[in-house]
């Protein structure tokens, strides 16, 4: 049922990052460029004069180009030519050199793919400089969003989980495409 507290699709369809990147690079795709510009534009003022900027779950790598900021280090669970560093955000290990050195973390439409968001946020705090920032942009689950997720059988949601439990994942973590689209609603 669309209005349920929980919906877990039987088959999660994988998203093709390569196709997404190809669409993004296509100069004719003006609608997607406009959407991405709107999605990222609010971040620009927070990135001024920042040196160490890390995006977790960078996917097609659009942020670096849309924000026109070469300082952004793109990370993802899978290695692609445009990704600077392969990192599983659920385990977030940036090494000792970056502890207390990161100015800004960006998580754009990726937090709902993290099986333990509270644990991730706690780990991120170890790497942030004093007064460092975490910029999060994640979908809010509305009636219409639930409807589209249900029809597409792409990703699910659950409001039944304890999102603040650092020891328990909120969904199975063996599939990088698993997600809980209720994360933004539950955290914020």
Model-predicted regions and their roles:
Residues 118-133:
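A short glycine-rich, Lys/Arg-flanked "PGG" loop and its adjoining helix->strand segment in the class I
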Residues 54-94:
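Class I SAM-dependent methyltransferase SAM/SAH-binding core
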Residues 106:
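A conserved beta-strand element that flanks and buttresses the S-adenosyl-L-methionine
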Residues 1-24:
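N-terminal, positively charged/glycine-rich alpha-helical extensions of SAM-dependent methyltransferases
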Residues 135-166:
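Conserved class I S-adenosyl-L-methionine
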Residues 109-110:
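Short catalytic micro-motifs in class I SAM-dependent methyltransferases
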Residues 30-51:
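Conserved alpha-helix/loop element of class I SAM-dependent methyltransferases that forms part
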Residues 179-188:
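Short alpha-helix
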């Amino acid at each position: 049922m669309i209005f349920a507290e929980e919906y877990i699709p039987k088959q999660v369809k994988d998203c093709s990052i390569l196709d997404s990147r190809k669409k993004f690079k296509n100069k004719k795709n003006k609608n997607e460029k406009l959407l991405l510009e709107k999605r990222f534009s609010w971040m620009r003022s927070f990135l001024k004069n920042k040196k160490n900027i890390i995006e977790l779950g960078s996917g097609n790598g659009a942020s670096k180009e849309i924000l026109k900021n070469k300082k952004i280090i793109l990370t993802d669970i899978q290695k692609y030519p445009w990704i600077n560093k392969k990192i599983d955000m659920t385990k977030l290990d940036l090494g000792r050199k970056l502890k207390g050195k990161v100015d800004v973390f960006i998580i754009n439409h990726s937090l709902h793919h993290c099986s333990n968001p509270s644990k991730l946020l706690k780990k991120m705090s170890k790497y942030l400089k004093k007064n460092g920032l975490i910029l999060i942009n994640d979908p809010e689950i509305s009636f219409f969003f639930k409807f589209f997720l249900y029809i597409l059988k792409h990703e699910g949601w659950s409001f039944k989980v304890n999102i603040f439990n650092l020891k328990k994942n909120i969904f199975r973590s063996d599939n990088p495409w698993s997600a809980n689209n209720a994360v933004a609603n539950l955290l914020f």
